UniProtKB/Swiss-Prot annotation:
CDD domains cross-referenced by the UniProt entry: Ribosomal_L7_L12
Gene3D superfamilies: 3.30.1390.10, Single helix bin
Organism for this UniProt entry: Deinococcus radiodurans (strain ATCC 13939 / DSM 20539 / JCM 16871 / CCUG 27074 / LMG 4051 / NBRC 15346 / NCIMB 9279 / VKM B-1422 / R1)
GO BP terms, alphabetized: translation
Official protein name in the record: Large ribosomal subunit protein bL12
Length: 122
């Protein structure tokens, strides 16, 4: 039995919502199917890492390195801290910024690493 796919699509497009509902019910009865969503157990593990991709990062100073003056300048520029606070941060390390967008966090990391610091994004 040959059919014209486009003609069938056009005919279905002309049906009202009630007519479509009746058609679906009739097809369910004829073919013995239900509208339950099929769940695949095997693919869930592979999809998890993509779904959990982080969008916000904390910029963490690990070590100021040898050129502390340049690192202190970058810390001040990034955080807006005063000279003393930025110096203390460069000596003890810690979180410089929390909840930063990925591209902005990577930019901050690059600036600090160019100044000689060791930085992590968490």
């Amino acid at each position: 039995m040959a059919y014209d796919k486009q003609a069938l699509i056009d005919q279905l497009g002309q049906l009202t919502i009630m007519e479509l509902a009746d058609l679906i019910d009739g097809l369910k009865e004829t073919w013995g199917v239900t509208a339950a969503v099929a769940v695949s157990g095997g693919g869930a593990g592979a999809a998890s890492p993509a779904a959990e991709e982080k969008t916000e990062f904390d910029v963490v100073l690990i070590d100021a390195g040898a050129s502390k003056i340049n690192v202190i300048k970058e810390i001040r520029g990034i955080t807006g801290l005063g000279l003393k606070e930025a110096k203390d941060m460069s000596e003890k390390g810690g979180v410089l910024k929390e909840g930063v967008a990925k591209d902005e966090a990577e930019k901050m990391k690059a600036q600090l690493e160019a100044a000689g610091a060791r930085v992590e994004l968490k």
